[in-house]
Amino acid sequence: MAVKEYTGLSEIRGPIVVVENVSGVRYDEVVELILENGEKRTGRVIIAGENVAIIQVFEGTEEMDIEGTRVRFLGKPLEVSLSPDLLGRTLDGLGKPRDNLGEIVPEKTVDINGSPINPSAREYPRNFIQTGISSIDVLMTLIRGQKLPIFAGNGLPYNRLAVQIARQAKVTTEEEFAVVFAAIGLRKDDANFIVRSLEESGAIKNMVVVLNLASDSVAERIATPRVALTIAEYLAFDLGMHVLVILNDMTNYCEALRELSNYRGEVPGRKGYPGYLYSDLASIYERAGIIKGRSGSITQIPILTMPNDDITHPIPDLTGYITEGQIVMSRSLFGKGIYPPIDILSSLSRLMKDGIGEGYTREDHPDVASQLFSAYSRVMEVRSIASIVGEEDLPEIDKLYLKFGEEFEHLFINQSFDEERSIEQSLDLAWKILSILPETELTRINREYIKKYYKASDET
């Protein structure tokens, strides 16, 4: 399609500009805006009318003059350059190098919006991805092709958890594995911590970091997760790699979506978010999966901060409808000094049942996970009773459950930022803690596994 150029804008509204008396303009078309001083900025068409185009400008509209700005419609959608050389690189939210290591010679360029996976071509997710974190690997196992979000509150260490997962994640087979880390609207100190941690550990060699700072434009923020997923699709379905995509923080993405919606003058929905928030999030989350006949996979961990710790807020609420489980971070565990402070009873992985056990992790894994959930639930009940009657008046079995709860939180859930545990180490640790309880309490575990792994402690 031919390039069309116009001079002058009709209106500037925040990161939005309006151009009138145009023709043949398409929705999602890339636009080049040339300021009077020769500076070039990039935008895309978000509304294409009969003779008007509304454009969101990725670099912002500061110092842009209404009369002197030239607008070029390039006749193509926003694309990202793809190459195996992307591994080890840090890019901006539009997929351009940010690490001063030179330009990337593209093998191909692809529209960042991708295309949805045909449901009939999807393969059911199986096989697990080891994160090296006991509570996740044993109790809410991440499965290849799954989308498993992390719900956190402000002030909780979700950035540390994201970095630890990115650094330690691996597949237990000999297949190739990579991580795409999209930092969306993060403060500079958080972004520096993430990049520095990944570089110092050497993990960045098998990663692509797509970095959008809080100081970058909200328009670029909308593109960031799509750029990251387009890169992931190339690594997975062209190069045959298993790819884990970490999207941190999707709340910042949704705030940017709300801001742009307000600039457009759209009718707001719940809490001011646009009515299409659900379908917009689905267009991102549903790019995870496995395609029949292809060797790669895309697994997603979207991370989002819940305003006021409200899990019913539209962002976590709608995310929960689209994804396959959730990992919830606990403020009370964080207050006890436990890291990662994962709320076990509020978290689950809906696909773990099909990717654990014999042939995947270890034969006792499903039973151990079920027993840990059951026992920890009993711990919560006993703690409630103890807060009323006191621990001294509890029966001996309840005192054992209290001891189990303390050991479970401080030895199993709690692990240091630099500690990586294999699935075997995590399961062995689970058995050690379960052995605090009498054998008769392990009602959810096959007798064969009890004989093999159970070792009664002195308390029992």
Swiss-Prot record:
Coiled coil: none
GO terms for MF: ATP binding; proton-transporting ATP synthase activity, rotational mechanism; proton-transporting ATPase activity, rotational mechanism
GO biological process: proton motive force-driven plasma membrane ATP synthesis
Entry keywords, A to Z: ATP synthesis, Hydrogen ion transport, Ion transport, Transport
Protein family (similarity comment): Belongs to the ATPase alpha/beta chains family.
Biological role: Produces ATP from ADP in the presence of a proton gradient across the membrane. The V-type beta chain is a regulatory subunit.
PANTHER family: V-TYPE PROTON ATPASE SUBUNIT B
Name of the protein: V-type ATP synthase beta chain
